[in-house]
Amino acid sequence: MAFYAAYHQDGRNKASHFIGVPMIILSLFIPLAWLRFDIGGVPVTAAMIFAGVVLAYYFVLDVPLALAMLAVNALLIWAGHQIAGLGAAQGWAWFAVFFVGGWIIQLVGHAFEGRKPALADNLFQIFVAPIFLAAEVFFALGYKPALHEAVQRRAQLSRAQSAESSTSLPRTSSRSGASGSRSA
């Protein structure tokens, strides 16, 4: 979580993710709701299976946060199924609105942050985003203050190391290659 937090320190960026991340999740649940199966006589959709796998990971990390994510996912799955029930044309249109809109909102947030999205460096961070947002709410309510402090400390250290490594790289002038001369 500290890796993800290092990319999300600006309040405006965090706020954008509270809007954008659920929009993207909802968008994915729409086409996944069209894939229906019977497992032991129980009708399920690919949206339910996908959410179940991700939630299993969250339960390994933290049970109270996973329970919160279970509630959020249940609402998003329900909404995804409702939209999917409108038919393919409307479903795909809403998918596009939520998916593209969610990414645009997050990218605006990252412009405020002045940093690229975490998933640009580690694709797995796409699964961390939802539980990170749940943790932010829980931390604001006083949940596990020691964990919150440790995450923030590691995030700040990661940002400092990233800034240090980016400033320690040799810089080249755009003119140095054109003139053929080298400065000492």
Regions found by a protein language model. Name each.
Residues 2-7, 111-170:
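Membrane-proximal soluble regions of multi-pass membrane proteins
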Residues 66-75, 121-123:
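Cytoplasmic-side transmembrane-helix entry/capping segments in multi-pass membrane proteins
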Residues 52-65, 69, 82, 98-115, ...:
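Transmembrane alpha-helical segments that form the membrane-embedded catalytic/substrate-channel core
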Residues 170-184:
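Long, low-complexity, intrinsically disordered segments
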Residues 1-22, 28-31, 54-64, 112, ...:
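Membrane interfacial helix-start motif at the N-side
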Residues 62-67, 89-92, 119:
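Membrane-helix interface segments
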Residues 33-49, 92-97:
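Structural signature of hydrophobic alpha-helical transmembrane segments
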Residues 26-29, 49-57, 73-80:
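Hydrophobic, membrane-inserted alpha-helices
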